[in-house]
Amino acid sequence: RCIRDSLRQALREVATSGELDSLLRYQPHRGRPQDRASIARHLRRRGITPDADQILIVNGAQHGLAVTVMAALNAGDVVAVDALTYPGFKVLAHAFHLDVEPIPTTADGPDLDAFEQLCATRPVRALYTMPTLHNPLGWVMSATDRTRLIEIARRHGPLIIEDAAYAYLVEDPPPPLAASAPDITVYVSGLSKSVATGLRVGFVVAPTSRVPSLERAIRATTWNTPALTTAIACRWIEDGTVDQLEAQKREDAKARQALARRELAGLPLIGHPSSYFTWVPLPDDARADRLTATLARQHISVSTAEPFTTSKRTPQALRLALGSTDLDSLQSTLRTVRRVAIEDGYA
């Protein structure tokens, strides 16, 4: 059953459920108790077991990150982030005047020696991290590295902000940081990536002591997430639609990643086997901006490293999004990318 059919069915069920009037009223800032209970059950399949009282429903994961920053940090606070990271967090850091400290990355995750050294020399208030399918590099931190990261955080005191937006794409990953360190971790995720981008339903799982300040931030920014969309999302959680859609997307992403590796043979690719994006590092003397401009003239949009970079030096690289078109069009597009790269001497 396609998502349009699922949506039609859910709308009919909501319309005849007898709760439509209540769904159109103001709701508790952190969401209705029954909806938070549904999300708690969903999160158990992600490897964490929060109480419903630890969950706050938000308008997507980006809103979840925003209210976390509002609730936990102040202007000038030092925040550790990967040297290449999600651009949406960079936007928040700039808007809230945070002091961003980049952590070098390895092939498998953040350089934990560098993170520990940073914590020893600067008053790091928070670490923003994507341990399960990093954007843009696609790595999944090992269980050993997760344990060490938590040990460093416990020694030095920073809050861990765990972004799990893409975690659904990884089968059987190590447990989230929030599973091992729920008292020092705020876990942020949502259904926009895994179900539908227009379904702006996200969730924050926080230590109980931080829930009131997060709730105030939700009140200040949106009052509450619309109960109508939350009700649809929770119906899909309960009837298995979310699990089905996530499984379909994992298989689709695997097919797209495999296609990219075939069509871009000769280019160095970095990415998870079930990721919807891949990273193409270029030589230091390359001009990624020139490549993107050439591709743009052929109606192909790719990104340089600049939006993802938090360090002073921007590496020469491209990020290719693989999920925005059908497979036939993607194949043609990838062939064009490879041809342009070859013409410029990069493959």
Protein language model regions, located:
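Structural signature of PLP-dependent enzymes
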Residues: 214-219, 237-261, 285
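Short hydrophobic/aromatic beta-strand micro-patches
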Residues: 205, 279-281, 321-323
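Hydrophobic residues in beta-strands of the RecA-like P-loop NTPase core, especially within AAA+ ATPase
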Residues: 81, 161-162
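Conserved glycine-rich beta-strand-loop-beta hairpin in the small C-terminal domain of fold type I
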Residues: 250-261, 269-282, 291-294
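PLP-dependent enzyme catalytic core of the Aspartate aminotransferase-like
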Residues: 297, 311-347
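Active-site PLP attachment segment
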Residues: 7, 179-213, 225-228
